[in-house]
Amino acid sequence: RRFSELLKSYKENPDSFKVNYRREKPTRRIDKVTEEAILTELKIEKDLIDLDDNPIVDYNYSYIKDRLESEHHTTAALPTIIDRAKKHGFYIKKKNKVAHDREVVTNYAGELVQHDSSHHKWSPYSDKKWYLITSIDDCSRFLLYYNLVEAETSWAHICALEDVALIYGLAYSYYFDCHSIFRFVQGRDSFWRNHYKVTDDVDPQVKKILTDLGIKVRYALSPQAKGKIERPYRWLQDRIVRTCAREGVKEIGDAIEVLKEEAERYNFRQRHSVTGEVPYYRLRRLKDEGKSLFREFVLPSPYLSSKDIFSLRDERTVNPYRKISFNKLVFDIKGAPIREKVDLRIVPDMISGMAEIRMWYKDNFIGIHTARNEDINLNNFK
């Protein structure tokens, strides 16, 4: 229709015909409300960067863009926000970084799960630092597990392993840094001056569980490779700290709610910069295409419960009185000969404060005892 109108105008007066279009108002101008909202968010960012003991060191303009939509109910293009930041002094020039040359490349979901923790002051209004524990599928970039805890223990990481196994299945391999919770390193973790045990001769609690489940374990052997694990944390860390600061979060429970919201955004709405896909839809597509190495969790024989797998492990020798001693606690033992070793599978309950101690002799389940978590000394388990 428009073409017909133009053709008619041309035929009526070809000498004076023009197609010039006059704009009635500029298109690159944003309204005053949006302008003020951008500056407000930029000022909050600057105050956050200036705080001491704070992991945030630069501006996140993409985060501000999201805040404009969610909190101010307006929109602005990312280049516009950056332009205003430069004009008003809210800009820090990025440093040149050395390219990471040891990428772990995977082709299947579940081929490799990156697992680690990050210790930071997640809210400037809290007087404590907390640990963020996450597990992320390398191929899909989907966050399989995420939680904030006040203390980093082997048990906290075992809970993460259990959640991933029961919800998503058993992965082909796990990728860790060389923290003592994940790996025994001779010289660093040995108490003996004559080092009869060399690196990897002693399996930490986490590795014992993965070995029982037939899951391979890989380690980051360089600072560059460790950066591969830490990069997913930077995105979460960046947004969690900023949101906690804006919402005045003081308690870990409130911070966990912020974490859930950001993880939900990351998993189900955020298009990943590397894959170009939303992690959830990429994970689902890989499964639909038969490109998943996740196996269904099946309880290994002869165990009776998932508690026998996802537990802290120890062993004790039955004394002539058919008792064992554990952290100054004494338990009667039935079903195991004296001078024989009994396997302990310990499952703490953080809500009740009590731990269930499941006793095994070889392939036989011989009973359950209970003890207070504090008497077990969870921090001693590596």
Regions found by a protein language model. Name each.
Residues 1-11:
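Double-stranded DNA-binding cores of transcription factors and transposases
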Residues 5, 66, 83:
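DNA-binding alpha-helical recognition surfaces that contact promoter or target DNA
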Residues 9-17, 74-75, 83-96:
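Short, basic alpha-helical nucleic acid-contact segments in DNA-binding proteins
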Residues 14-29, 92-105:
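Short Lys/Arg-enriched helix C-cap and helix-to-coil transition segments
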Residues 24-77, 118-124:
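A short, amphipathic alpha-helix used for macromolecular contacts
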Residues 98-115, 134-136:
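Well-ordered mid-protein domain cores that form the structural environment of catalytic cofactors
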Residues 112-132, 138-254, 371-374, 378-382:
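RNase H-like DDE/DDD metal-dependent nuclease/strand-transfer catalytic core used by mobile genetic elements
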Residues 263, 267-382:
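C-terminal, beta-rich DNA-binding module of retroviral/retroelements integrases
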